[in-house]
Amino acid sequence: MASSTPSSSATSSNAGADPNTTNLRPTTYDTWCGVAHGCTRKLGLKICGFLQRTNSLEEKSRLVSAFKERQSSKNLLSCENSDRDARFRRTETDFSNLFARDLLPAKNGEEQTVQFLLEVVDILLNYVRKTFDRSTKVLDFHHPHQLLEGMEGFNLELSDHPESLEQILVDCRDTLKYGVRTGHPRFFNQLSTGLDIIGLAGEWLTSTANTNMFTYEIAPVFVLMEQITLKKMREIVGWSSKDGDGIFSPGGAISNMYSIMAARYKYFPEVKTKGMAAVPKLVLFTSEHSHYSIKKAGAALGFGTDNVILIKCNERGKIIPADFEAKILEAKQKGYVPFYVNATAGTTVYGAFDPIQEIADICEKYNLWLHVDAAWGGGLLMSRKHRHKLNGIERANSVTWNPHKMMGVLLQCSAILVKEKGILQGCNQMCAGYLFQPDKQYDVSYDTGDKAIQCGRHVDIFKFWLMWKAKGTVGFENQINKCLELAEYLYAKIKNREEFEMVFNGEPEHTNVCFWYIPQSLRGVPDSPQRREKLHKVAPKIKALMMESGTTMVGYQPQGDKANFFRMVISNPAATQSDIDFLIEEIERLGQDL
C-alpha cells in the first residue's frame, strides 16, 4: 500500500493509494485545520482529535503538526508556543465561576489574570484581523432602543452585584460587535479613520502605564517624548527650534480654545486676574467655513458668539482677504478691538486652505494674532509635494495640528503649537503647591502640567512618538501622498458622469471630494426649488440604506443654501482604488430607485 505522505508520485496519481486516506489529500488537511483554528480553542482541539482517530500514525503527525503551525503563526499567545514562559501559556479556564476579585492584586490571582488577559487579547486580535477583511461589515447597525433593550445577552444596564468574568468577556466581544469599525478600509465617514497597528500597541502600553502628564516626577519618559515631538512639529511648521512652546490637548476644539486664550493673554494679561470687565470690547474673526469650535470657544471664554465675526468665503470655501480687512475696519469704527483671526488649513467640509500669506499681511498691518487651524490639513506639512498648500503658516502665532486625522494616529492626538515661549505658562499657571513644588531635585521646567487648562492629562504622545519611530517622516509622507492620490482618483472617476455632480468646480485641494448623486428621476431636470428639495433628501436616504446594509459609510451635509451632498474624505492608509470603486458602485446600487 502506498504511503499517504505527499510526494511527487502521490500527487501525480492515486494508483495504489489507501482507499481510506485518498479523501484526505493535503488540501483537505489544510481545510480542516483552518476550520479548527476558526473555532474556539476547545472545539478546535476536538476536531483535531477526531481527525487523529480516523487516520494512520503518519496522518496523526501530519494533522497535529499542521494545526500547531497554524496556531503558532496566527496566535503567538497560544499554549502551543513552547518558547514562552509557562505562566503565559493558554490553559482551559472556566471563567463562569471567576470574578474581578479573583484577579490581581488578589492573592494567588496571577494565573487567572494571565488567562483572562489572554482571552481579551484574543478578542482584540480577532477584531483587528476582521477590521482589515473587506468581507466584514463596517457596522452591524441597530437602533438605540434595540441596544438599550438588550441584544442576545448584551445588556447595557449596570448591576449591583458583580458579574462573572465569562460575562465580562461576552461584553467585550459584543461591545466591538455592535460598534463601528472605523479602521475598516471602506469607512469614509469621519476625518479620523484607520487602525494603525503600531499606534494600537502604543495605546495598549499607555493604558498599562496609566499615568498622568502633569509632572516629570510621575511621567518622566512621556514628558520628554512630548517635548521632543512638539519641538519637531514646530520645526516642520517653520519656526526656530530654540523658541516656541506647545502641548497636547483633548482634541482640535480645545487646541483652538488654547490659541484664543493665549492671544487674549498676550494683548491683555490683566484678564487672567481681573476678568473680561477689565479689557475693552474684543472681537475675533474666523471664516464662515471654519470649524464651529471657534464660535464655541467665543461663548465659553466670555466673548459671546455675536463677537465672533464671520468672514466671507469664495466658491471654494477660502477666506476673501478683502472682506477680512473690511470687517476689521467696520469693527474698529463701532468701538470694538480686533485682536485675533483664525485661518483654516483644510476646512472640514470642502477641505479648503485659506490664503495664509495674505491674511498674515493684514494681521501685521492691524496687529492681530494669527492662528492657523491645521487640525485637518496639518498632516500635509509632512509631504514635500503638498506642503505648499500651507504656505505662510510659519508666520502664524499659533497652530492647531491633529495627528489623529490625516496622519492616522489613534484618537485622541491633537497639538497646540505656539510661536512664543512662555505664553501658555503665563496664561494658565496657577502654581498649585501640592503638585508643582519649586524645590524638587530635578529641573522643574519639565513639569508641564501648569500650562494646561486641565489637571489630569491623558498620555497622548506615546502612540504618536512610536508611530513616528516606526514609519519615519518619509513613511508619513508616503501615507499622506497616497490618500491624496486616491482623492484625485475619485474626482477623475465621477466628475464627468451624468449620475454625479460636483459641488464646486476644479480638483479638490485635500482629500475632501464633495458631490451629489443624481438619481435617474432627477437627471436632466432644470434647477428649481422643487428639484433642490428632492435632491436634499437623496443623500440621507442613501446613507440610511448604507448603514442598514453595513457595507460602507460616507458622510453628507448641506453647506449654506446647497442641498445635502456627500463629503468623501480619505485618511485611512488601508484604503485602495478598489475601495473607491466599491463606494461609487454602492451609492449607485442604493440610489438607483430613488
UniProtKB/Swiss-Prot annotation:
Keywords linked to the UniProt accession: Decarboxylase, Lyase, Neurotransmitter biosynthesis, Phosphoprotein, Pyridoxal phosphate
Gene3D superfamilies with a match to the protein in the record: 3.90.1150.170, Type I PLP-dependent aspartate aminotransferase-like (Major domain)
Presence of keyword Signal: no
Ranges for region Disordered: 1-23
Ranges of Low complexity composition bias in the record: 1-13
Entry-annotated residues carrying Phosphoserine: S78
Pfam families: Pyridoxal_deC
Binding site for 4-aminobutanoate: Q190, L191, S192, R567
Record carries keyword Cell cycle: no
Reaction catalyzed: L-glutamate + H(+) = 4-aminobutanoate + CO2
Cofactors named for this entry: pyridoxal 5'-phosphate
Enzyme Commission number(s) from the entry: 4.1.1.15
Family: Belongs to the group II decarboxylase family.
Job description of the protein: Catalyzes the synthesis of the inhibitory neurotransmitter gamma-aminobutyric acid (GABA) with pyridoxal 5'-phosphate as cofactor.
Description of how the protein assembles with itself and partners: Homodimer.
Protein name: Glutamate decarboxylase 1
Gene: GAD1
